[in-house]
């Protein structure tokens, strides 16, 4: 038994995405000696939270407490957890467990985020057997398997680290794994919560040139302040596609729209260039692509989903070493309902972080 309660903002149906979450107690997964209990101090608001609250990607097993950009203090650590001790400042991203079997090619090779045997998300998942459900970080406490709990390096603030645990890693992982670095010109499509990390990390990884790509010219000042070398406004620059054709080695697209000009984005790539899609619209449908668009320029298209625990640790250390700061606005946890509405309305520059004032 613990001397603390698991309480948080619960969505009971799809209307909870309209700012109708209700504070209440929930039962975390059954404790095992592989788990860590975290006293939550900070939790970023991610677009995934809104998709899940409204059952946009899949039917949500309500009640659901969202939030998978969690930072806090480890207050209970299972005997089999070797990397964390009580009192450590720790974080949890979008994944709470995988199958963790030695014969799983993904789990045994640092690709736990692609395990297809036993993937458990930080919230909205049902554990196998009778272990219960996963509940996220819009809460006082969180319980997660210790393999997916990472230490937050000294020198990196909790409010800056929290949104990196999903938003940051979603773009850091494909940048690093697709050759972002010296000699490369990189484009980031969509400069919001995810895209602003794309610019920060592309520069930190040493890309020669980083180009921000979004719809409106009004974002240019912010994008250049983040460190981008150039900016393309697709709504306001009439000839953007032809003027910038075949100039980029790598594009990471954070846009979650089935109507995005995907063919035109591909045209920005040099011959043999790569586009990695990380944004996922409700339903998952992307615009169609003509085969000749790919054949004529040897384009490669791929995808990337979050990152492994080792990827996250590497990203956090880079952020600490390079003194990367997230562009965030903090909000009290008690204002979570209004904060998700403001997030949906696009008011965040560029991420909201909920602060649990009882534990901060």
Predicted features along the sequence, with ranges:
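C-terminal hydrophobic helical "lid"/dimerization subdomain
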Residues: 1-4, 263-264, 309-360
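Glycine-rich beta-strand-centered segment in the early N-terminal region that forms part
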Residues: 27-43, 56-108, 113, 135, ...
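Short glycine-centered segments of the SAM/dcSAM-binding site in methyltransferase folds
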Residues: 89, 185, 273-274, 300
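NAD(P)H dinucleotide-binding glycine-rich loop of Rossmann-like/cofactor-binding domains
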Residues: 98-189
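Adenosine-nucleotide cofactor-binding segment
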Residues: 182-191, 196, 203-263
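Short, glycine/polar-rich helix-capping loops at beta-to-alpha or helix-loop-helix junctions
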Residues: 215-222, 284-291, 311-312
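Helix-to-beta-strand junctions that scaffold the AdoMet/dcAdoMet cofactor pocket
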Residues: 269-271
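Rossmann-fold dehydrogenase core element
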Residues: 274-276, 288-329
């Amino acid at each position: 038994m613990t001397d603390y309660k698991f309480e948080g903002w619960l969505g009971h149906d799809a209307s909870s995405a309209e700012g109708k979450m209700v504070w209440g107690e929930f039962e975390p997964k059954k404790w095992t000696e592989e788990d860590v209990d975290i006293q939550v101090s900070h939790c970023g608001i991610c677009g995934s939270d809104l998709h899940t609250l409204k059952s946009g990607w899949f039917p949500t097993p309500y009640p659901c407490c969202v939030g998978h950009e969690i930072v806090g203090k480890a207050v209970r650590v299972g005997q089999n957890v070797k990397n964390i001790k009580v009192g450590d400042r720790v974080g949890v991203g979008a994944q709470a467990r995988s199958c963790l079997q030695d014969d799983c090619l993904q789990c045994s090779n640092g690709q736990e985020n692609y395990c297809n045997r036993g993937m458990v998300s930080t919230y909205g998942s049902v554990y196998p057997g009778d272990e219960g459900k996963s509940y996220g970080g819009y809460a006082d406490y969180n319980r997660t398997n210790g393999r997916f709990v990472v230490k937050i390096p000294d020198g990196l603030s909790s409010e800056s680290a929290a949104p990196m645990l999903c938003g940051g890693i979603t773009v850091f992982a494909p940048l690093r794994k697709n050759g972002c670095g010296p000699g490369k010109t990189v484009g980031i499509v969509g400069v919001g919560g995810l895209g602003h990390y794309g610019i920060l990390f592309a520069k930190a990884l040493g890309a020669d040139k980083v180009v921000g790509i979004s719809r409106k010219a009004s974002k240019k000042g912010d994008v250049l302040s983040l460190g981008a070398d150039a900016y393309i406004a697709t709504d306001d620059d009439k000839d953007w596609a032809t003027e910038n054709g075949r100039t980029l080695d790598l594009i990471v697209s954070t846009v979650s729209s089935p109507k995005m000009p995907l063919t035109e984005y591909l045209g920005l790539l040099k011959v043999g260039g790569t586009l990695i899609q990380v944004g996922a619209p409700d339903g998952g449908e992307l615009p169609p692509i003509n085969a000749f668009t790919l054949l004529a320029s040897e384009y490669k298209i791929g995808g990337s989903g979050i990152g492994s625990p080792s990827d996250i640790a590497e990203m956090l250390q880079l952020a600490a070493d390079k003194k990367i700061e997230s562009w965030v606005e903090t909000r009290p946890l008690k204002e979570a309902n209004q904060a998700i509405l403001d997030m949906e309305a696009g008011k965040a520059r560029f991420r909201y972080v909920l602060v649990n004032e009882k534990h901060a």
